């Protein structure tokens, strides 16, 4: 937004998706550069973010009330309690906000049940990128850039219960052969069975993540993880495109945009429309656009649709090219059968 001279977080009324109407622009500290941390709890009526950037920011957390009118968020607090900022998570009830910074290996939990007076609950040394919280608030599913990179399942029940001096316990950790930079991990159930949908961003070399601007041979992409036994999670399927397969990487290396510093042929975010019996996963696959997978059989996902938006010139085109690539976490309007992304 700064590069396009649209400073801050812009709020739009999307009642008519063909004619979006901007209703507010949020320019408090965290909203000037929330990086990947912007989260909403519909149940709690809360919008929150932590000041961040591609490395890490100083951890200022902004909390807005959106319970009355989400088109006009009301600032409740702006405090330097996030320690360091890059990514985040929020409990479904909107009472706990997590500030994650993989570069500094810090994860902070804040009590935001009173959004005007947030308070620290816990801080730990985890290289957390994005994280999602279970419906009961007792588990955190962490996309970890630690050693090894992969997914962590953390027992955060003492934070949820607001115990004094809460302790967080590691339930399990998992990695995979194609791991690059784990981006986010989202739990869901399908026919009563528990899974996690996890996505890695960008590409890497055989020795792990490499600079984003390099067309690496190894693409993390996305996967479905069976967590029926949360102490022994296992990858049961992958959400990948042909351009992600190592055998094809050299052939496509000279394609326009393949060496794009913002990611080229790789993944960035995936999301599901519901955590209970979702039928699809939508993924922002950067240069490959929006890709839709049928996951009714989680062990055998099938790509069923894709969309590459028309090129729209930017005010500034360096380092990023004209914007027809997909980066954001897809959002859903199921009643209108819509998917939104940028």
Q: What residues fall within each predicted segment?
A:
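Feature marking well-ordered beta-strand scaffolds used for ligand recognition
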Residues: 1-342
């Amino acid at each position: 937004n700064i590069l396009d001279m649209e400073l801050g977080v812009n709020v739009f009324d999307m009642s008519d998706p063909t004619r979006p109407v901007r209703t507010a622009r949020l320019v408090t500290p965290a909203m000037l550069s929330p990086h990947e941390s912007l989260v909403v709890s519909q149940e709690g009526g809360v919008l929150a973010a932590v000041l961040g950037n591609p490395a890490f920011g100083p951890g200022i957390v902004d909390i807005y009330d959106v319970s009355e009118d989400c088109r006009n968020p009301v600032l409740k607090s702006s405090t330097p309690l996030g320690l360091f900022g890059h990514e985040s998570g929020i409990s479904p009830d909107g009472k706990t906000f997590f500030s994650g910074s993989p570069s500094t290996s810090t994860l902070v939990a804040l009590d935001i049940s009173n959004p005007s007076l947030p308070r620290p609950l816990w801080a730990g040394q985890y290289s957390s990128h994005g994280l999602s919280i279970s419906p009961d608030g007792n588990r955190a599913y962490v996309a970890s850039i630690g050693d090894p990179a992969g997914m962590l399942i953390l027992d955060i029940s003492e934070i949820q219960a607001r115990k004094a001096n809460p302790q967080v316990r590691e339930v399990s950790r998992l990695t995979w052969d194609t791991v690059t930079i784990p981006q986010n991990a989202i739990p869901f159930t399908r026919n009563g069975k528990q899974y996690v949908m996890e996505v890695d961003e960008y590409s890497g070399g055989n020795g792990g993540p490499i600079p984003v601007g390099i067309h690496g041979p190894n693409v993390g992409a996305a996967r479905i993880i069976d967590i029926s036994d949360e102490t022994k999670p296992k990858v049961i399927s992958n959400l990948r495109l042909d351009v992600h397969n190592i055998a094809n990487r050299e052939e496509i290396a000279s394609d326009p945009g393949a060496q794009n510093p913002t990611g080229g042929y790789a993944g960035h975010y995936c999301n599901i429309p519901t955590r209970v019996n979702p039928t699809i996963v939508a993924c922002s696959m950067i240069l490959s656009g929006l890709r839709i997978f049928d996951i009714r059989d989680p062990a055998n996902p099938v790509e069923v649709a894709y969309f590459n938006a028309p090129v729209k010139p930017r005010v500034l085109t360096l380092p990023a090219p004209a914007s027809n690539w997909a980066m954001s976490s897809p959002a859903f309007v199921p009643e209108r059968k819509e998917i939104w992304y940028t």
